[in-house]
Amino acid sequence: MRASLSILVAFPALAAARDVVTIGMTGSWHPADVTEDNTKLLGTALSGSSFSKSVGDKRVCYSEVTSLETQVVAGTNYRFHISGCDVTDSDGECSTSALSSCELSGFVVQIFEQSWTNTLKVTNIKAEEAATASSSSTPAPTPASTSTSASSSEETMLQSSVQQRAMFSDFV
């Protein structure tokens, strides 16, 4: 009787936990709202000194953030779609002089943030056309090893479910 009562109590908790795992699943890109905070994050990253080697000497400034996508990994990847200028040195937002001497273009700026290690790094800067073509055929590189495949996502959910069941079995 006691065991069946424990199962009745644990089952709804497991069902709710499964929904949480599904909603917050790592690995896939999701549209996000452009906010003042994430726009400040973009400015801080572009004006900083932490750029991946793959970025090389490429620098951009932005006049507008047109859209944003995020990806949860061992931290957060941000994919900013911006209207901006190709520059030699960036302070984030385009200055008046930069805007007067360039033609605005679309760029995709990818940033990795890991708040608990104070990591903020620009990992990729591409022209919008090139970025659109490459992101549709090749998954974006991530600092942590994650997979966007369905089987990997299902495996992650299964592992979480098994861990949760093991946790609840201690109470039975």
From Swiss-Prot:
GO terms for cellular component: extracellular region. CDD domains: CY. InterPro entries: Cystatin_dom (IPR000010), Cystatin_sf (IPR046350). Keywords: Protease inhibitor, Secreted, Signal, Thiol protease inhibitor, Virulence. It is found in: Secreted. Residues 129-172 are annotated as: Disordered. The record marks 27 as: Reactive site. This is Cystatin-like cysteine protease inhibitor EPIC4. It comes from Phytophthora infestans (strain T30-4) (Potato late blight agent).
